[in-house]
Structure formats: C-alpha cells, structure tokens
Amino acid sequence: MSARGADLGRLARQAMIERGFEPDFPPDAMRQVAALSGPATDGSTRDLRALPWASIDNDDSRDLDQLTVAEELGDGAVRVRVAIAEVDTSVAKDTPVDRHARRNTTSVYTAARIFPMLPEKLSTDLTSLAAGEDRLAMIIEFVVKDDGSLGVSDLYRARVRNQAKLAYGSVGAWLAGQGPMPAPMAAAPGVDAQIRLQDRVAQKLAARRLEHGALELEVLEPRAVMQDGEVVDLRQQQHNRATQLIEDFMIAANGVTARYLQAKGFPALRRVVRSPERWDRIRALAAGLGETLPGTPDAKALADFLVKRRTADPLRFPDLSLCVVKLLGRGEYTVQRPGGPAEGHFGLAVSDYVHSTAPNRRFPDLVTQRLIKAALAGARPPYADDELEGVATHCTEQEDAASRVERQVRKSAAALLLRSRIDERFDGIVTGASPKGTWVRVLNPPVEGKLVHGWDGLDVGDRVAVRLVSVNVERGFIDFVRAG
C-alpha cells in the first residue's frame, strides 16, 4: 500500500522554514561552489592511500565523512586510524557556503528529501570520502590496548583512498553470520580481515565504556521507505554490530580530539549531556519495575539497571529507553576554555567529548576541524571565545529544531501510510500516560498515535488492542480508540 511522497516533500520544506532553516542555498554560495575545479589537494601531507580504508554508512549515503583502518601491534594492542573528510580546505571560514552552513548548522534527513548542510557538489563529491577517489583527510590515530583502554594518540593530515564503500545492513549481517560477504568487500583485498579486526576492537571499546557506566539504550526510529516517490512502508532502523563498530570508533576519536585540543591550550566546542535533573523520576521508573537506584545520579547503576531490563523484557525495553532518554535531557554544545572545568557526557560516561567526525553534515564538526588545523599549524584559534559561545548556543538550538523537523515528517509519513486503513485494528503498547493524553505505539507498522477514547486504567507498558479512527497528514496526527 503506497501513499504519495509529493505531499511529504512539501510538508518537509514547510517544516524546515517554520523551524528557522533555509532549505535552499543562496546564489552566492552556489557561485562559490561552481568555481571549485576539483577536490582539495596537498602534496606535503602523508600518503596513506595504500592502506585498506573502508567506509560503513547507510545504504544510500553519499556524503561520506569517515573511513577506518586498523593494524595489530602485538600484545593485544591495535592501532586504529579514523580518516575524517577534509572540508575546511574547500569551505573557508566566513565564505558564503560557510555562512549558510553556520545558519542551518546541520543536514536534515527526512523521508521525502535530504536538506544537506553543504551543497551536494561538496558533500557528496569533492569533500566526500568516495570509493576509489583520492582525498585529503584529517587522521585521528589511537592505540587500543587489550583491555579496551586507549594508549598513545596523534592527529595529522593525510591523503587517503576509500577501498570499499560498505553499508551497515550487509556488514552487520555478515559479521553476525547471517548474510554473505558484501560484494564491495569481496572486491577489495584485505578489507574483510580489516572489518573483522575492527569489530573485535570495537567490542573491547564498548565493554570498557559499559564498565564505566555508559548507557546502552534502544530507541526505535521508524524510517519511511520510499519507492518511485511514494511512501510504501515504515521500517525500524536496526542497530547491529556494524553500526556499533562505527559508533565505538567515533566515540573514541571524539575523545582523542577533545584531549588533543586541551593539551594544545585551545578552546573546544564540547558536546555534553549533563547529570540528569530528573533523576528522581528515573528512580521512580526503576522502582515501578522492582529495582532500586541510588539517591544521586549514578551512570553505572543506571547502566546496570538497563542491561537487566533489556534481558527481562526486550519487547518493552525500547519504550523504557525512550522514557530514560527524555528524562536524561538533551545534549548541548558548550565552550571548553583552556584550563577551565570540563563537563562530561553522562550517557557515554566520558569526561572529554567533542563532535569531530562528520564535518560534511554538522557545523560543530567543521568548527572543530578548523581548531585542529590551527593547533597543528601552531597558529591562533580561528574563533574567539565569545564567537564560539554564540556558535555553541545556536548549534544546540538548531539541532533541536532539526530533530523536530525530522520527527514531524516521520509522523506525517506514518499518517500518509495509514490514511487508507481507518477502522483497522492493531496491537500496541502504551508509551505515555499523563493528563495531556495517552499514547500508544503500534507494533506493525511501527507508529505512535494518541488514544482518544478508552484510556481509563491504562499505564505505560500495558499492552492494548486499538482501532484507528482518524489521521491528519498535515499535522502528523494519528488517533486511536481502544478496541472492544
């Protein structure tokens, strides 16, 4: 059953404008890009093109920001190199493209359309780490010891070449023994052994973080499936060993970058999640499930509780995860001044963290890249502290706005898909119950809607049969009543 995507595209653009984004690039930015004759080059940098680099991303991603490669050193230690797209050389500070990126601050991904932070000639071509292409990159290098702790690290620029463009789904299935070796991997000698090695290292990194209280959450994010411009299905985005591999490597790389800037006496645009103010409510959730959490925020205790609940009730765990995420509060960007107190990331259980690994997609990462390059060159920081403060505040606000745009379009896509299924019955789980209303997550297709009648006696986690009574595509409303 399909639904028109044209309406969804219009709603996505409308949502962008309403949230303060500029969905189109201004003429001066496009003129700047048109004047670029090719990708940036620098013959003075290290030449690492012969290494078996590979990218792992979504199936349809063309804005490739990262490549990874690993090398065994002995005694269980492994050297990891993460190559990050060199964007700053093609997008100088205070140019038209930079000013547009600074206003939007992020790429926005909706089912109907992607609104890239940078023009596609850059993000999917000249500054993308595309397969088979020579590119400049920022290298974040670190040694992972046998126990998952980090050893020596370094940052430098180099030339790289992506030997295999891989996708999360096929790599994850292959790693789990549930699918064949992906064709691009089979065509690139040595990449299969590389990914196996990287998977082992990533598991050590993850285990180390979990020991220190990193939270292992599972929030369901349905994605609209488009075919010939129409919404044909909603599917959950599956996390697997391939997504975990990249997440663990990027977390490590971001920490190395934060500590590098600190050691150089540079300011940094830190990514923080503060200690949760609503810890009392998280404790109440745990108590309702027969568990006790400490009186003050304790990441390790919360992590242990979540691991236990995932095992005890995997069906309801995504809903518990969503509640915890909301109670933890959103992440934000802050300025870390040299010698000043550092704020950490509660959810990742790390004290030093920046965003540095996606400069094609996020403005904070481009800012961080400029800071790194200045530090490497022995130059002054390209941003004054007060300018960084403004960037941090604006990026936090725009990230929240982008999430709202993406959520609004997901809801409208779900309403589009369901509008021909009025009066059908669905099985669901109550995900929210308050004076503002009762909300139900339907299992198939994976959508959430409001229970407008028959909510008496229901609470979060209860299973319930519901009947669809109305949808509003424009507003993304889906209304259910309790089925008799």
Task: List where the protein language model places each region.
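Short, compositionally biased
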Residues: F480-G484
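Electropositive polyanion-binding surfaces
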Residues: M1-F21, F25-D462, V471-I478
